[in-house]
């Protein structure tokens, strides 16, 4: 009888220990923050559902191509204080930009020397750039400007990452 009682007590203790260990592992799993699991790469033409705000705010590269489809592309950008995207025009496609964090100025116009449209931008602002409009976006604040951009059709090569603005400018031929 004493042996059975010791055996049952041991089984009870093992069960209790296993249960508490399982709870600890579960608690650790639920404590994972989204930023701990973000993967910065081009997810290609596969379906992709994600928190765009988390990705945009956590991106430390000047430009990261996050998704390149057949006819559309999504990039996220981190424009440092005093930097800009560089004056450019896209003749064959429109562009959508949304500011997630930071402040700056957007300029647009019909010619490289005529940027008559100028607006201040900040968190949650959207910018719609028609095909054929010259444009530039300037970070005139002391904090990074975090944004995402959608091109239709795509603008950059699959899996493009530019860690800095200088790297982006060196790759200008492909942009």
Enumerate the predicted regions with their spans.
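Positively charged n-region of N-terminal signal peptides that target proteins for export
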Residues: 1-4
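Glycine- and acidic-residue-biased ligand/ion/polar-headgroup-sensing regions
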Residues: 92-111
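A short hydrophobic beta-strand segment most commonly corresponding to one strand
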Residues: 96, 143-158
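A short, N-terminal "cap"/entry segment at the start of jelly-roll beta-barrel domains
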Residues: 22-73, 86, 119, 162-175
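Short beta-strand His + acidic residue motifs that chelate non-heme Fe in jelly-roll/DSBH
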Residues: 87, 106-107, 129, 135-141
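C-terminal motif of bacterial Sec signal peptides marking the signal peptidase cleavage site
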Residues: 17-20
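Conserved short histidine dyad/triad with adjacent acidic residue
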Residues: 75-92
